[in-house]
Amino acid sequence: MSNRIKKVVLAYSGGLDTSVILKWLIATYNCEVIAVTADLGQNENFHDIEEKAIVTGASKAYVVDLRNEFAKNFIFPMLRASAIYEGRYLLGTAIARPLITKLLIDIARAEEADAIAHGATGKGNDQVRFELAAAALAPDIHVIAPWREWDLISRTALTTFAEKHNIPISTSHKRYSKDQNMLHCSIEGSELENPWEEPHIESYTMTVPIEHTPDSPEYITIDFEKGDPIAINGQQMIPADIMFTLNDIAGRHGIGRIDMVESRFLGIKSRGVYETPGGTIIHIAHQDLEGITLDHMTLLTRNQLIPSYADAIYNGFWFSPEREAIQAFMDKAQERVTGTVKLKLYKGMAYPIGRKSSNSLYSSQLATFEEDTSYNHNDATGFIKLKSLRIRGYQKS
């Protein structure tokens, strides 16, 4: 295999793992390596990352701004579908992997590369996500997964390799391993490997501790068009700016923290500590607007499809017929979800306190408990009698 592979496109973060992988690929496969970094809104110094890739041995280093594409074509479709994994996780890491893989494939095609490579470990979900996406997009391109090939199985071994090959590494010890983009930040390591231990205050990046949040609530409005957020407090923005603005607003109120034990696709239980400030507000506001614009059966069908849709994303099947079919239903249902939601933000919570829509199904005349002329109470008698036919006598003693 190594004789056949001459050029590899590597998903590169600039950290210890992918820097070691870059040098390892050159040494093991005697190949050219092109480093690719996707800007998905993470707080990184991309100039330094690009420079480090070249110093470490990459023939080229790409840094590609995918922020608006990520928000518009990946985050927003997922939020339109109200996707949530195991009832809690808003899929911030999982949704980024298909876009990163697509970028790797596009550059591999342009550079006539033989393979792509990633730095996902052999225990996690990301290896599956990268490789399933690659299989769907470019089954002819080989995927190299160094963590499943090499014998560098510890942080000490990686550091020793880096020092031996003069790879620049940070001397400061990082307590946590973090993966961040414009939708969320995931935190792993240290005391978090014990599911009983509370996360340390320094583990969080995007949200303020509840103890330090404002003592007065903040009120905001979010405008939606066909299920997508388009404006905050009446100001229209592009999708990426919607995410950044809501992250700032929600983050200062400590909104969007999740601490859970989840089921990995490989069958392993793992602890997930996540921050999803802006995404949490959108998720809450969007579902609230659906309540006034969608009928019961559409909502029921949507709710039945959410677990399958979320599983598809979590397990790496973004580019799959089932995900696309469910997306088609979700997007059809969202044609009515246009309007405005008013929220009260306070001490880690986002409360919808008002909603309006030109497609509203709410009728104050029908809903009122006061006297009205549009509803005949006697009509309920026949309705109840018909609905009782199926269960009449079911519990008869």
UniProtKB/Swiss-Prot annotation:
Amino-acid positions noted as binding L-citrulline in the UniProt annotation, renumbered to this chain: 89, 125, 129, 177, 186, 262, 274
E.C. numbers: 6.3.4.5
SUPFAM superfamilies according to UniProt: Adenine nucleotide alpha hydrolases-like (SSF52402), Argininosuccinate synthetase, C-terminal domain (SSF69864)
Keywords linked to the UniProt accession: Amino-acid biosynthesis, Arginine biosynthesis, ATP-binding, Cytoplasm, Ligase, Nucleotide-binding
Listed CDD domains: ASS
Entries under Gene3D superfamilies matching the protein: Argininosuccinate synthetase, chain A, domain 2, HUPs
UniProt entry tagged with the keyword Transcription regulation: no
Protein name: Argininosuccinate synthase
Source organism of this protein record: Lawsonia intracellularis (strain PHE/MN1-00)
Organism lineage string: Bacteria, Pseudomonadati, Thermodesulfobacteriota, Desulfovibrionia, Desulfovibrionales
Gene name linked to the record: argG
